[in-house]
From Swiss-Prot:
This is Biogenesis of lysosome-related organelles complex 1 subunit BLS1. Keywords: Endosome, Transport. Transmembrane segments: none annotated. The gene is BLS1. GO terms for cellular component: endosome.
Length: 109
């Protein structure tokens, strides 16, 4: 067999391998791994979001709802917007007085 025919035979074999449209066992295994990886990531992401949402709800939303339900009836019984404003004004004054006392204690003590 001549050198040219060997090169042509080698060229055909390489073209057959590189331009093949059929998957090899390795390629099929690789595709399966990638699809499993995507599936696992999707499941893990969903679970992570659920955990985050649950934790956020338990630590933030539920306590605020409890406070709202505990005090909203009391405030609503007091009446209109004027009463609300008076209650808020009173609370702000209490906070201002408390801050002033804290500052006085820090500067004096």
């Amino acid at each position: 067999m001549s050198k040219a025919s060997k090169e042509a035979l080698l060229e055909r074999a390489l073209n057959k391998i590189t331009k093949s449209q059929t998957n090899t066992n390795v390629a099929e295994a690789h595709e399966e791994i990638e699809s499993n990886y995507a599936y696992i990531n999707e499941k893990q992401l969903k679970r992570l979001v659920e955990l985050h949402d649950t934790e956020f709800k338990d630590k933030c939303v539920v306590p605020l709802q409890r406070l709202y339900y505990k005090y909203s009836d009391t405030v609503l019984c007091d009446g209109d917007l004027q009463n609300w404003a008076e209650l808020i004004d009173r609370d702000i004054r209490v906070l201002e007085t408390t801050l002033a006392k804290v500052r006085d204690n820090q500067s004096g003590g």
